[in-house]
From Swiss-Prot:
One of its GO terms (biological process) is translation. Keywords: Methylation, Ribonucleoprotein, Ribosomal protein, RNA-binding, rRNA-binding, tRNA-binding. Residues 1-31, 105-125 are annotated as: Disordered. The modification 3-methylthioaspartic acid is found at D89. The keyword RNA-binding applies. Part of the 30S ribosomal subunit. Contacts proteins S8 and S17. May interact with IF1 in the 30S initiation complex. Belongs to the universal ribosomal protein uS12 family. The lineage of its organism: Bacteria, Pseudomonadati, Pseudomonadota, Betaproteobacteria, Burkholderiales. This is Small ribosomal subunit protein uS12. The keyword Ribosomal protein applies. PANTHER family: 30S RIBOSOMAL PROTEIN S12 FAMILY MEMBER. One of its GO terms (molecular function) is structural constituent of ribosome.
């Protein structure tokens, strides 16, 4: 517990919080170019082949980002939009790629949660 005099001399220091997505630099999204598109395996209790891409962003950062949804059309040199948000069972993956934006198409035949996967409203029969 500081004395009043110590507080007058130094004041209180605010705790600096570390960003969970530093490559965004405070912005909501960032454009980038895929340098590598591949699959990787998740941490211990889970088992799958998760689709990820290494993306070089416009601000020079190179990040690993997750491609959500079933199936994708990404390849090297595809231009994508990256948002923040980590994947809990993939270490080092702290970003998501936005579906239905720039070169990445939305998920085909998606009926529910369409806005999250860039899917258009299905036509009435």
């Amino acid at each position: 517990m500081p004395t009043i005099n110590q507080l007058v001399r130094h004041g209180r220091q605010t705790e600096v919080t570390k960003s969970k997505s530093p490559a965004m630099q405070g912005g909501p999204q960032r454009r980038g170019v895929c340098t590598r598109v591949y699959t990787t395996t998740p941490k211990k209790p889970n088992s799958a082949l998760r689709k990820v891409a290494k993306v070089r962003l416009t601000n020079g950062f190179e990040v690993i980002s997750y491609i959500g949804g079933e199936g994708h059309n990404l390849q090297e040199h595809s231009v994508v939009l990256v948002r923040g948000g980590r994947v809990k069972d993939l270490p080092g993956v702290r970003y998501h790629i936005v579906r239905g934006s720039l070169d990445l198409q939305g998920v085909k035949d998606r009926k529910q949660s369409r806005s999250k996967y860039g899917a258009k409203r299905p036509k009435k029969a």
